[in-house]
């Protein structure tokens, strides 16, 4: 029986309607359809148009119906077209025509027989069309609907493949799909469209376009995919509805994906696949899996959700989005991406065979579950580096962002203003040549930023990095860390920690480091620190603004402030022990205990304008250290304390001590103090050895006045014009040169005790 359809514009309803009449009786039925569906049936101009078509009605039957002729076909409401032969199809069409089928609401095509198929359709030019408003069902390996040579499926009803696919031990892929395209095609679903099966849509080859506004629900025991693109495929996937896959073989091993692009038999994918999501994509394993191809583009729009994982499954490695290969892949997330797993779980993963590309996040990317290696964004790569731009939020139990450039040219992370990355380690670098720019927040329970590699560049500009360690370099050389104005690094232990290597730390004016134990800690290697901002250590015991441990060397240049606020034993603005460290200070160093504490072989240059203040401003606790002071050194008890031998102090600035300006402790030998023009000393100069054998000596050079009492030194040698106005001067030297006037005039206004004095010719005492 034939039926004639008219598509007309109904002004009262504001929509197109389909009217039909039986060719034999003239009776008419009205079926309303959306304008978008009407457009699919008829190419329309801007104004409403009227078209007529006559369809051949396929009657209810239990044998295969073979299409013939060019007239469109319809399965009417109430009709069921099926086959009682399990391996055959209910409707078949060869390649003599492009077939056009309409399945009305309430109509059924296919059966529940094992391995049955609803439609097996070839096509003359690839223009075969199936519009389903009813139910299409099957259980065949080659799909409920098989499109052999292109074509389109429009689904406003229900399409299902009821087969149960068990785990194939030989990993042979199966095609238990609702729609199976051998050579490209398209699938379009309205909000009412439902597609269910082990897989939803499988594209074997060619160009395909999938637009889902309804539901694709794939539920198999293993290898279940919402949309699968295979060998040589390319095209687009647009989802405004829901794509869900769940699959488990019962042993904890699962392999399912909402979107899966890959290749079979090592065939190359000839093109690219783009994914555009503003709906929901969900999977137990990998939600969007792009495994073979190049130049992929994925957009998750505002309101879009891509999520992976299942808390009821143990030992699962879940990933919301994984791109294993591809050059210059682009991922943009404005919505929500999340993954749950107990091992190696990722929000977005760029695999080892990717090169270049950009990840842009303005939404949220989250992983939970606490598995080792978890990351919101994990980038490998083996070619050009990948760029990650974040102005949204990223959070994870392990890593927020992990950049692995062991095989690539180095990646780039731009954490922009207003953004936030949080995890046990907010950002981790493994490899060389990576670039990190932070204007937002990086918050780590352990590390805000972890670096393992060489020649990485880190710049924080107006942002904040925090953690137990703000920034930690576990190994590597040539790394450059710069904190610009407005930046803040906060830590419950150490602001910047460097384990080894030769690296550079620069903090500019307006930046701040606030930490409990160490503002900056250098454990070994030749590392340089330039501070123009503020460094503050707040701990109550053994806290340091900058600490160089044994084996560490380098140069500290301070034009800013370095402060400790606790009153614990051993606190110091700068603490250097081990290798040779040169300290150049023209800023401010302030501590309640020690300003600068050094052990052996270090150099302190307190330049003009430089200020060092503490209970003991400068402590030499070792040998062969050098102090040159042109600024101000002020100690509540001692300005400078020397405990060691072979140290030199050269002063043309100000040294103040509540008790001693300069104190040489007992057992310290062969130390030399030189006071030059411009010297201001307040407090005593004391050598606790009080022994000539200690051989600690004072040299007066240039001109000036010294009002300090002097006691215990081996000798005083004057080479210039000096006035000693202190109350006493007691020297321990046993020769006539205990007091030696080599040139100029030396005036003594106090009492002197010495074994002898030498006044050279032409000089005055």
Protein language model annotation of sequence segments:
Residues 1-6:
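Short acidic, Pro/Gly- and aromatic-enriched capping/linker segments at domain boundaries
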Residues 8-51:
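Gram-negative bacterial Sec-dependent N-terminal signal peptides
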Residues 43-61, 718, 727:
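Extended, small-residue-rich solenoid/repeat segments and analogous flexible loops
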Residues 52-58, 71-88, 102-116, 128-143, ...:
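Beta-strand-rich solenoid/repeat architectures in extracellular/passenger domains
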Residues 62-68, 86-95, 114-123, 141-148, ...:
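Glycine-rich beta-solenoid repeat tracts in large extracellular/virion proteins
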Residues 661-670, 686-759:
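Extracellular repeat-rich scaffold modules on cell surfaces
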């Amino acid at each position: 029986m034939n039926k004639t359809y008219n598509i007309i514009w109904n002004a009262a309803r504001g929509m197109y309607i389909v009217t039909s009449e039986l060719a034999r009786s003239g009776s008419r039925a009205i079926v309303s359809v959306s304008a978008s569906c009407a457009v699919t049936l008829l190419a329309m101009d801007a104004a409403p148009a009227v078209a007529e078509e006559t369809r051949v009605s396929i009657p209810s039957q239990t044998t295969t119906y073979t299409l013939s002729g060019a007239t469109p076909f319809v399965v009417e409401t109430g009709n069921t077209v099926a086959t009682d032969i399990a391996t055959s199809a209910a409707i078949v069409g060869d390649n003599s025509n492009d077939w056009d089928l309409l399945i009305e609401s309430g109509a059924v095509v296919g059966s529940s027989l094992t391995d049955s198929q609803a439609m097996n359709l070839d096509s003359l030019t690839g223009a075969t069309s199936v519009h389903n408003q009813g139910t299409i069902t099957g259980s065949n390996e080659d799909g409920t609907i098989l499109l052999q040579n292109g074509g389109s499926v429009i689904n406003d009803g229900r399409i299902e493949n009821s087969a149960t696919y068990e785990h194939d031990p030989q990993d042979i892929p199966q095609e238990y799909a609702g729609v199976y395209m051998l050579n490209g095609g398209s699938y379009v679903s309205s909000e009412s469209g439902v597609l269910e099966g082990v897989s939803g849509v499988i594209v074997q080859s060619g160009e395909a376009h999938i637009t889902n506004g309804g539901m694709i629900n794939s539920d198999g025991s293993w290898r279940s995919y919402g949309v699968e693109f295979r060998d040589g495929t390319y095209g687009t996937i647009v989802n405004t509805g829901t794509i869900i896959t769940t699959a488990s073989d019962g042993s904890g091993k699962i392999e399912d994906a909402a979107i899966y692009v890959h290749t079979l038999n090592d065939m190359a994918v000839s093109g690219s696949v783009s994914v555009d999501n503003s709906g929901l994509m969900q999977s137990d394993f990998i939600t969007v899996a792009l495994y073979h191809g190049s130049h992929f583009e994925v957009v998750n729009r505002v309101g879009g959700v891509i999520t992976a994982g299942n808390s009821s499954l143990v030992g699962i490695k879940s990933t919301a989005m994984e791109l294993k290969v591809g050059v210059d892949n682009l991922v943009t997330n404005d919505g929500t991406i999340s993954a749950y797993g107990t091992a190696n779980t990722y929000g977005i993963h760029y695999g080892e065979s990717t090169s270049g590309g950009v990840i842009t996040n303005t939404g949220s990317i989250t992983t939970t579950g606490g598995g080792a290696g978890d990351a919101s964004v994990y980038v490998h790569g083996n070619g050009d580096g990948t760029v990650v731009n974040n102005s949204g939020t990223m959070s994870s139990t392990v890593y927020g962002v992990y950049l692995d450039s062991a095989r690539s040219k180095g990646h780039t992370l731009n954490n922009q203003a207003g953004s936030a990355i949080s995890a046990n380690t907010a950002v981790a670098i493994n490899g060389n040549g990576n670039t990190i720019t932070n204007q937002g927040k990086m918050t780590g329970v352990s590390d805000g930023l972890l670096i393992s590699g060489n020649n990485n560049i880190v710049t924080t500009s107006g942002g904040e990095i925090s953690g137990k360690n703000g920034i930690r370099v576990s190994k590597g050389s040539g790394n450059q860390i710069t904190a610009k104005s407005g930046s803040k690094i906060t830590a419950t232990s150490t602001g910047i920690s460097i384990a080894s290597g030769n690296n550079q730390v620069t903090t500019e004016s307006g930046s701040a480091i606030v930490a409990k134990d160490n503002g900056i800690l250098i454990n070994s290697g030749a590392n340089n620190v330039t501070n123009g901002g503020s460094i503050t250590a707040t701990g109550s015991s053994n806290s340091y603004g900058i600490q160089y441990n044994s084996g560490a060397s380098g140069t500290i240049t301070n034009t800013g402030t370095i402060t400790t606020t606790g009153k614990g034993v051993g606190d110091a603005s700068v603490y250097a022990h081990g290798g040779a460290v040169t300290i150049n200070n023209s800023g401010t160093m302030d501590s309640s205990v020690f300003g600068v504490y050094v052990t052996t072989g270090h150099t302190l240059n307190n330049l003009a304008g430089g200020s060092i203040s503490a209970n003991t401003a400068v402590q030499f606790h070792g040998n062969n250290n050098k102090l040159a002071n042109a600024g101000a050194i002020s100690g509540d008890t001692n300005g400078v304390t020397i405990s060691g031998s072979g140290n030199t102090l050269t002063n043309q600035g100000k040294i103040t001590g509540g008790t001693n300006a300069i104190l040489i402790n007992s057992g310290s030998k062969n130390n030399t103090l030189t006071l030059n023009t411009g010297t201001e000393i307040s407090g005593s100069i004391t050598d606790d050895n009080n022994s000539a054998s200690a051989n600690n000596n004072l040299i007066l050079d240039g001109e000036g006045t010294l009002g300090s009492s002097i006691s215990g030194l081996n000798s005083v040698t004057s080479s210039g014009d000096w006035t000693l106005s202190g109350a006493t001067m007691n020297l321990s030297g046993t020769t006539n040169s205990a007091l030696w006037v080599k040139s100029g005039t030396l005036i003594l206004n106090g009492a002197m005790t010495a074994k002898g004095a030498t006044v050279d010719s032409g000089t005055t005492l």
